[in-house]
Amino acid sequence: LVLIAGNLRAVGVLEENLNKISPWHTDVPLLGGLVAMVGGFKAVIFGDASFHRLVYTYDWWAPSRALSILPGQRNTVTPITEFPFWTFLFADLHAHLYAIPFSMTAAGVGLGVVLNFSRLNPAGAAGEHVRAREISSWAMVFVLALIVGALRWINSWDYPPFLLLSAAALIIGERAKEGRFTLRALSIGVMKSAVMGVLSYALFANIASNYSQAYSSVERSDQTTALGDYLSHFGILLFLITGFVLFNLNRTITRTNWVRTMFFGGARRRQPLQTLPVMAALVTAAATMIWAGTFERWGVIALGGVGLIAVILVAARELRSPTPTAPVLLFVYAMLALGLGLSAGVEMFTLEGDVGRMNTVFKFYLHVWMIWGVVAAFGLWYLFAVMRPQEAFLRRAGAINASIVQAPRYAFAAIALLLLALALVYPYFGTRARIHNRFDPSLASTNDGLAFMNSTNIRPESSGHDNVYSAHYDATGVNGEHELRYTRDGINWIREHVQGTPTIMEANGPSYRSLGNRVAIYTGNPAVSGWQFHQEQQRVKFGAAVGARAGKRHGGASRR
């Protein structure tokens, strides 16, 4: 769910392609897309439509732009909605790609902290040396500081959310060690979190002292996300998470666990919270979310509010629970709450200087995807592996009654399986379309990243004020401005004969599609200037110097 799954926008792209070739169409709400997909597959299997064409005309780029610009919004730059599979498939080696394994490691170590601290609980120590375990808990603080501190310099966007998640792990760990939530546990957890934060900076102080931060403030966002667009990106994960939360919410707020009995054959027992006030609050919040969603302005914020209310309720139960699983559930709820907070946060604020809110949504939505992918997988496992029906209950109920009371469970499982299948649409269609979308589609599969140069040329094309070199496939090798096979020869010569890492001097290209840094890219040597816009955007304090280095004239033209 973290690394392989695609979003529902990817399914929408497939539906659009199938709709073009489908002989069946209907305007009935909710059924139109399904009818078109069935008709499209019929045309492929039994008609004249080509499955090959269906695959290779698939728009693999579109799922990374799942959000639309709402009417009346001033900024018209579409936010980026990458997910890890798309990121690795696109293979653009930006910082967010490098940060993914480190971010997941931070979450994993956070869970390790919770489990390690749980073993410090005298009830669960099982004869282990408590002092040694306490020392190891401080070692985990150091490990967290090292990983989270590294994230700040690998991809600074990842630092705040995973610092918060790591702090939550330390506080939950102290609660696990105490066996219950106390002021002492909270104080020690906050103290260890502060130590971790200081260490995360101190361990990389040499980098911090030589680093200039171009963007360091936020501003109010003038863009918001339509709730439907939000669900087209996170819908699969949210469905799985919702089932997990609703089950645990029922255990918390009901006096009689009728949902648990129906789904899992659990025993009836009373709970301390009054059902009516809590249910009234949730219904009111849900109605507000639906109302806000109809105006396409505050739907995501309202969803976050409803979700946070539910998380607080289920977390409150685990704070009081003496069971050994309570700390793990608390950590999972902390991950869920962090994702809700990030989702609502980008609706209200954006990084000052961002292109609209393109990168703010991009980076924080990617965090939400990684965090919620773990929560969804855990929730699915928890519902169907941990909370299975009790055999004694099923024997008493009999075959027919057992099937009836488990019907909701089967329905949830069926929908979950369907959504998991839809999550694989992008890995299949997106991968094949992306591989086909290259300079020379006739090339066989290869690990040689330079193979395209044997049959690809570049030529100048007009783009605004700049003459941009763009690559194109030309099997004849006649019409191109420059044949890249000669560039390949030069690259191979540098690789074989040049020692060290001397700076490569090559023509500046203002567009990232211009291959302007191709020699530096394929040799690994430093260049004088990269893609002009990226350089100016990421070094905004030194924009004039970057422009001068790139040979930029006043008036926007580039000197060749």
Question: Residue spans of the language-model regions?
Answer:
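Aromatic-rich transmembrane-lumenal/periplasmic boundary elements in polytopic membrane proteins
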Residues: 2-89, 211, 215, 429-443
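Signature aromatic-anchored transmembrane alpha helix within multi-pass, membrane-resident enzymes
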Residues: 1, 138, 189-201, 277-285, ...
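Membrane-interface alpha helices of multi-pass inner-membrane proteins
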Residues: 87-90, 141-154, 286-287
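Membrane-interfacial loop-to-transmembrane alpha-helix junctions, especially the N-terminal start
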Residues: 129-141, 184-197, 256-282, 299-303, ...
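Membrane-helix boundary/interfacial segments in multi-pass membrane proteins
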Residues: 85, 90-92, 96, 213-233, ...
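Extracytoplasmic
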Residues: 427-560
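Perimembrane helix-loop-helix junctions
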Residues: 110-136, 162-197, 214-225, 241-258, ...
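Hydrophobic/aromatic-rich transmembrane helices and adjacent perimembrane loops
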Residues: 100, 162, 358-382
